[in-house]
UniProtKB/Swiss-Prot annotation, chain A:
Residue ranges that the Swiss-Prot or TrEMBL entry lists as coiled coil: none
PROSITE patterns named among the record's database cross-references: GST_CTER (PS50405), GST_NTER (PS50404)
Residues that coordinate or bind glutathione: 11, 45, 52-53, 65-66
Protein name: Putative glutathione S-transferase alpha-2
Designated gene of the protein: gsta2-1
SUPFAM superfamilies xrefs: GST C-terminal domain-like, Thioredoxin-like
Keywords: Acetylation, Transferase
Enzyme Commission number(s) of this protein: 2.5.1.18
UniProtKB/Swiss-Prot annotation, chain B:
Annotated GST N-terminal domain residues: 2-78
Sorted UniProt keywords: Transferase
Reactions catalysed: RX + glutathione = an S-substituted glutathione + a halide anion + H(+)
Function: Conjugation of reduced glutathione to a wide number of exogenous and endogenous hydrophobic electrophiles.
Residues holding glutathione: 8, 42, 49-50, 62-63
Matches recorded under SUPFAM superfamilies: GST C-terminal domain-like, Thioredoxin-like
Domain of life of the native organism: Eukaryota
Enzyme Commission designation: 2.5.1.18
GST C-terminal domain mapped to chain residues: 80-198
Cysteine pairings via disulfide bonds: none
Ranges in a coiled coil: none
This protein's name: Putative glutathione S-transferase alpha-5
Family: Belongs to the GST superfamily. Alpha family.
Amino acid sequence: MSTSSVPSLTYFQGRGLGQFSRVLLSYLGIPYENITVTEISDALRATLPYGQLPIYRDGDFVLTQSSTIARYIAKKHNFMGKNLEEEFLVDQIVTAIHADIFPAFNNPVPEKLQKLYEKYFGSFEKKLQETGFLVGSSVTLADLYVYVGFDYIRFRGEAALSSELSDEKYPKIAELKKFFESNEGVAKYIKERPETKF
Amino acid sequence: MTKPTLTYFPVRGRVQFPRCLLEYLGEEYNFNEVKTISDDLRKQLLFKQLPLYQEGDFKIVQTPAIIDYISEKHDFRGKTKEERARAHQCLAGIMEVLDHCLGYSFKMDKQQQEKFRNESPIKKFFEGFEMVLSQNKYLASGEKETYVDLMAFVMVDYVTNLGLMPSGDYPKLISLKKHYESSPQLKKYLESRPQSNF
């Protein structure tokens, strides 16, 4: 277990659900300890409320559920929008990616995935074309989530029907990707992360 | 102030979570029951999905985002950032339980239900909630109840109704269920809600 004074994020070596918070912490320039494991040992399992990773530790404060971790960090660093309404508009996008898009990879059905991408990424693209940001008038966790989700599907390749998410079809989301990847912290993280299968 | 409106199908499904919350908090609201999603309604839906929560010009979808928004309005999310994050961590778990059950509960025969209860993918969540409640009075680990205690009741009530309660003993969750079932604020809704099997 980490004894460091900086927060730690524990997840498998792959990108998966750990990616959202890793990219977020890197983008916000928050130092953190990136702990990777190959399996959940009994000792680790005993500390996990639902037997699942990722887990985030900040001193004595322990948190699981990737969307909860990301929202907690974002809220702490004013990255959830400018007011209450914006916070919950961000939340609905974060929830959509976690609850609707990610589970679809478990049993991928090409026709279903295609429709799913059109429905969600189509709506994100439209919003970005209209206002430049997914929520409000500045970048928020919602934009970062859409970038990470989009990028992750492309990384997963044809098993995840990645060819559906082309720059031509989603030019504004592709711009979002460029925006985040030009951030110093994110660029450093991407350069250093290991090549993995998931 | 405008009375909020919740739009959903004539079943319990996802909408029972925000409905129970509004009932418990004593907030008047309109329930707009629809059999199908009309073209007009579809245009208002960010991801073409229900439930939809509307309050004046403010519209929000995704059940957890709706729950969080209502709770914030009523100061029912927890006192500190940490408490709110712990509540959200539990809510994310509750939504995973809901997703497991909603997907195929009404397609199961008695034998499949029995198998589900014994090898339940939701068991780890019930054990996690039970553990938190055996160490703390409330799920967010604060000194007062928050929305997530009520949401845990709705989860247990729903899973019981579907005949999918995982095997094992959950005295704290059962006690939580009894507590909210006897709540005068919920009585009317619990008696008049749709008798649907999902």
